């Protein structure tokens, strides 16, 4: 079986792009800014990532009660439909490459295995990024500085 993944460099470049954006922003503003990285606005607080040609291209946007963007996530790999040793090796390798690249750029990650392996970085400027190795994919969640501050105040 063959699966696709965006490069770890591309995933981290996307995070760096969003970390360097002016915050706060509404979901509509985020959708428009996303066009600079090849993402297209979609219905109702969503974006689409056609550039990396992964099996799941949706980029859902979460919003705070104030109407500001809280976070959004994107797939760094295809979604694996048939589980097995080959799929596990693919996902493990892609996750390891992503964590290695993130560590080179942002320093040591806070690691967790609570719901599967994940690595979290609190970035300069206040934003937060989490790379996760799920059962069927590797994902990246970007949290805006405003919502990351809320999470820190809650002890998360």
Q: Which residues fall in each region the model found?
A:
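Short helix/turn-capping signatures at newly exposed starts of structured segments
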Residues: 1-116, 128, 133-156
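Glycine-centered tight beta-turn/hairpin loop motif at sheet-sheet or coil-to-beta transitions
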Residues: 124-126
């Amino acid at each position: 079986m063959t699966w696709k993944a965006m490069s770890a460099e591309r995933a981290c470049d996307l995070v760096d792009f969003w970390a360097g954006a002016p915050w706060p922003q509404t979901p509509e503003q985020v959708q428009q800014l996303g066009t600079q990285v090849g993402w297209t606005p979609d219905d109702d607080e969503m974006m689409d990532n056609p550039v990396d040609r992964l099996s799941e291209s949706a980029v859902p946007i979460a919003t705070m009660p104030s109407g500001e963007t809280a976070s959004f996530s994107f797939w760094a790999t295809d979604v694996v439909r048939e589980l097995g040793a080959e799929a596990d090796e693919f996902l493990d390798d892609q996750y390891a490459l992503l964590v290695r690249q993130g560590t080179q750029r942002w320093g040591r990650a806070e690691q967790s295995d609570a719901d599967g392996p994940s690595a979290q970085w609190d970035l300069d400027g206040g934003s937060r990024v989490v790379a996760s190795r799920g059962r069927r994919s590797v994902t990246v969640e970007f949290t805006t500085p405003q919502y990351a501050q809320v999470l820190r105040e809650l002890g998360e």
